[in-house]
């Protein structure tokens, strides 16, 4: 079964065809095949279904946009995303500023771009580079009371994510791009060059 992302699919059985069928959990693999096949730019807006837990930030069914572009880097993709949001917001709302949950969101301004390490330093005051090893990172997490989900196997990357969730996420009101996530956060990440 080729499904891509590290998530469990919803499974059913098609009685007339007598085969098991799966609802898709991502759009990534087929789009990447198109890029390899010679298309320079591809995207899909599609429904995604993941047979996993639910909470206020995770729904098992959602719509995503996935896009890939040859001959660019992730900064080029960041530019594309900003322009996409700016254009859609202007065309749909007639303005580049919208109100969401009582807060004005300025989509038209240049978005802040921070590495995850810089975001944690900015909002938590914690310097990732001061951690000599995983144990030092875990000790720092304990000191700041963000170690609830961590254990003795947690790496510096896990600790960075814990700080991000505890101190950074709630401060990201205006459009902001966070990049250079630690490799432990996603199975398909390519090492930063």
Walk through the language-model features, giving the residues of each.
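Class II aminoacyl-tRNA synthetase-like tRNA-binding/catalytic domains
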Residues: 1-76, 86, 149, 176
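Conserved small/polar residues in nucleotide/adenosyl-binding loops
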Residues: 187-193
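Intrinsically disordered or highly flexible coil/loop and linker segments, enriched in small
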Residues: 40, 73, 90-94, 98, ...
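Short coil/turn segments at secondary-structure boundaries
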Residues: 44-47, 97-101, 130-135, 151-157, ...
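Aromatic-residue-lined binding/catalytic grooves and analogous aromatic/hydrophobic interfacial grooves
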Residues: 140-186
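A conserved active-site cap/scaffold subdomain adjacent to cofactor or substrate pockets
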Residues: 59, 63-64, 68, 72-96, ...
């Amino acid at each position: 079964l080729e499904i891509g992302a590290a998530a469990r699919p919803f499974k059913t059985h098609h009685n007339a065809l007598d085969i098991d069928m799966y609802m898709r959990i991502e759009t990534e693999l087929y789009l990447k095949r198109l890029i390899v096949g010679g298309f320079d730019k591809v995207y899909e807006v599609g429904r995604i279904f993941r047979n996993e837990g639910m909470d206020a930030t995770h729904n098992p069914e959602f719509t995503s946009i996935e896009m890939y572009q040859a001959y660019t880097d992730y900064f080029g993709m960041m530019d594309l995303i900003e322009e996409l949001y700016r254009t859609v917001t202007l065309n749909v709302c007639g303005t580049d500023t919208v109100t969401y949950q009582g807060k004005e969101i300025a989509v038209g301004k240049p978005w802040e771009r921070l590495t995850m390490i810089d975001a944690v330093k900015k909002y938590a005051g914690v310097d990732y580079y001061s951690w000599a090893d995983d144990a030092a990172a875990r000790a720092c997490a304990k000191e700041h009371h963000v170690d609830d989900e961590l254990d003795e196997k947690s790496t510096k990357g896990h600790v960075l994510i814990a700080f991000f969730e505890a101190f950074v996420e709630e401060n990201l009101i205006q459009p902001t791009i966070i990049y250079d996530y630690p490799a432990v956060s996603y199975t398909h990440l390519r090492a930063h060059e």
